[in-house]
Amino acid sequence: MNFSAVILAAGKGTRMYSNKPKVLHTLAGKPMAKHVIDTCEGLGAQNIHLVYGHGGDQMKAELGEERVQWVLQAEQLGTGHAVNQAAPEFADDEKVLVLYGDVPLISAETVENLLDAQPTGGIALLTVVLDNPMGYGRIIRRNGPVIAIVEQKDATEEQKLIKEINTGVMVATGGDLKRWLAALKNENAQGEYYLTDIIAAAHDEGRAVEAVHPVSPIEVEGVNDRAQLARLERAYQAAQAQKLLEQGVMLRDPSRFDLRGTLQCGMDIEIDANVIIEGNVTLGDNVIIGAGCVLKDCEIDDNTVIRPYSVIEGATVGEECTVGPFTRLRPGAELCNDAHVGNFVEVKNVRLGEGSKANHLTYLGDAEIGKRVNVGAGVITCNYDGANKFKTIIGDDVFVGSDSQLIAPVTVANGATVGAGSTVTKDVNENELYISRAKERRIANWQRPTKK
């Protein structure tokens, strides 16, 4: 579909009480403006013009300078003035869609309906009927067709009774839009150039104005404060949870589940309460995710159990594995099939071989660990000397006793045993027992020191 979009995002967001531009506050882990940009890109917008004012450098850094055409509105003189800043870039014959960076839930389906509804030479306008329309511009109709929009502060008492309101989202042809914008005046209670005044201008020229309703009213709710943002967050999460339930995912408590990215699921998935999904996550068949887990940019294969309060980021977990509770898998962690990682174990940039176990109180970093290895409680791979990181290599069928330290770079060969409490500074040979302990001393009749 041949269209360009203008996203208005110049507001300061005073009621957010934040140094951050309002449209950079996140919904589902993503800036509000990015939701709108993604929707436009998904529909194939030819150009996306983002009108900004406050915090431009920060917005460009977070949203990406290359994704949109940045248009500065140095003074905030109204919505019509904002769109007019981008008007020189409009092609005369293209559809121009006006959206808002603080209205993040607008759906592709609603936008498509609006674009399709634009009459030739006219305007398609997104409206909604509210029980309490206070504060919104009212839709004025004459015998059915829309003829104007009147803002709350300019409305008569009779007009204030109208419940159909303007969402601000509209489509017009570029050439017409440029002409109407150039003719706007600021003779109103706000002293601003209202975009809504182009509706009356179109009507005066005999152009049709078509009103379209969104698929869901929540799509056109804007954000002016943190309470409204929290409301939209919950609405978004409820919708995501409902989709997953319909796809066969068992969410034990849909109201306590957050999807802040994308989730691909196999069959018979169970997800307990207070689980957060971030980035791109893939779950195989028969995966169980315990309560309070955070999964980010990871892949978990079939028949694996992630026990409660585990944090997994940038990791891959094989089939038939058990992780947690209270495990942290950091980027580069790879658990092969039937691996077990237990409570208070941290794994970073490690390949843990098939059938290997680290069940308690362990740090494994920058290591290659073979098959059927048992790593005892309190074991640490000492991978960092304060300046550089080094690798630990552990072969197959190795037993590393509790409270041992492996000082990298070091290799423990196949079948070796490291006795509990050892500090390993040199390579251990195959099938060798390595013990490194201080000499035991016993002092009979020992007298403890007393305070003086």
Swiss-Prot record:
- What are the subcellular locations of this protein? Cytoplasm
Q: Where is this region: N-acetyltransferase?
A: 248-452
Q: Name one GO biological process term.
A: UDP-N-acetylglucosamine biosynthetic process
One function term, GO molecular function aspect = glucosamine-1-phosphate N-acetyltransferase activity
Its Enzyme Commission number(s) read 2.7.7.23, 2.3.1.157
What pathway is it annotated to? Answer: Nucleotide-sugar biosynthesis; UDP-N-acetyl-alpha-D-glucosamine biosynthesis; N-acetyl-alpha-D-glucosamine 1-phosphate from alpha-D-glucosamine 6-phosphate (route II): step 2/2; Nucleotide-sugar biosynthesis; UDP-N-acetyl-alpha-D-glucosamine biosynthesis; UDP-N-acetyl-alpha-D-glucosamine from N-acetyl-alpha-D-glucosamine 1-phosphate: step 1/1; Bacterial outer membrane biogenesis; LPS lipid A biosynthesis
Detail which positions bind acetyl-CoA: A377, N383, Y384, S402, A420, R437
Question: What does the record say about how the cofactor binds?
Answer: Binds 1 Mg(2+) ion per subunit.
Catalysed conversion reaction: alpha-D-glucosamine 1-phosphate + acetyl-CoA = N-acetyl-alpha-D-glucosamine 1-phosphate + CoA + H(+); N-acetyl-alpha-D-glucosamine 1-phosphate + UTP + H(+) = UDP-N-acetyl-alpha-D-glucosamine + diphosphate
Keywords attached to this Swiss-Prot or TrEMBL record, sorted alphabetically, are: Acyltransferase, Cell shape, Cell wall biogenesis/degradation, Cytoplasm, Magnesium, Metal-binding, Multifunctional enzyme, Nucleotidyltransferase, Peptidoglycan synthesis, Repeat, Transferase
- Cite the active-site annotation: H360
**Location of the region described as Linker in the Swiss-Prot/TrEMBL record:** 227-247
InterPro entries this protein is in?
Bifunctional_GlmU, GlmU-like, GlmU_C_LbH, Hexapep, Hexapep_transf_CS, MobA-like_NTP_Trfase, Nucleotide-diphossugar_trans, Trimer_LpxA-like_sf
Q: What is stated as this protein's family in its record?
A: In the N-terminal section; belongs to the N-acetylglucosamine-1-phosphate uridyltransferase family.
According to its UniProt entry, what is the function of this protein? Catalyzes the last two sequential reactions in the de novo biosynthetic pathway for UDP-N-acetylglucosamine (UDP-GlcNAc). The C-terminal domain catalyzes the transfer of acetyl group from acetyl coenzyme A to glucosamine-1-phosphate (GlcN-1-P) to produce N-acetylglucosamine-1-phosphate (GlcNAc-1-P), which is converted into UDP-GlcNAc by the transfer of uridine 5-monophosphate (from uridine 5-triphosphate), a reaction catalyzed by the N-terminal domain.
Question: What protein is this chain from?
Answer: Bifunctional protein GlmU
Q: Which source organism?
A: Aliivibrio fischeri (strain ATCC 700601 / ES114) (Vibrio fischeri)
Its lineage opens with: Bacteria, Pseudomonadati, Pseudomonadota, Gammaproteobacteria, Vibrionales
GN (gene name): glmU
